Amino acid sequence: FMNRAGELPGEDEQFEAYRAAVLAMNGLPVTIRTVDVGADKPLDRMSVNELRHEHALNPALGLRAIRWSLSEPAMFRQQLRAILRASAFGKVKLLVPMLAHVGEAMQTLDAIARAKQQLVDAGKPFVDVEVGAMIEVPAAALVMPSLLKLFDFVSLGTNDLIQYTLAIDRGDESVAHLYDPWHPAVLKLIEGVIHQARVAGKDVSVCGEMAG
């Protein structure tokens, strides 16, 4: 999706890329995140304009990640179908970035169900995949019990979690010194997420700079 000019990749192009990654892992699980663009991960201008994505005053708080996908349901289902098709070639997990509302989670799961039905109708093979939620918005960390009822696993996205918890743009050099992974508020949120996941018997992983 990034570092390319013109149209975004179609379903078959995505499928080939995902399948290659799955096959290269020789049976080990592959976690594929749905489109996570916006803020520090922008698309090129032509692709953005194609999707009617206007320049935002504060992209970190705007139409990005799962919000962007849900605003473009046809594009989103296209990616979901490609990921599901790749699951026929090995162990695949699907990860949803930047969830903040249970309503977004429900919309996402509905989109996955629709994509599955489209593949069934087309006679294309796939297997059921585990679906996980990225916890990178404080709101998500604080409603973990509700999200854990809907998802199979969670992944702590520490870079954005720190940014949103401390109200700091990590790309802004004037406040970069305040970006603190060891801030008590950040650690309390992380502790809560891990505890709730353990209580629910769900796996939790960590990504971002804190993961090392």
Task: For the regions a language model picked out, list residue spans one by one.
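Conserved alpha/beta-domain cores
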Residues: F1-G212
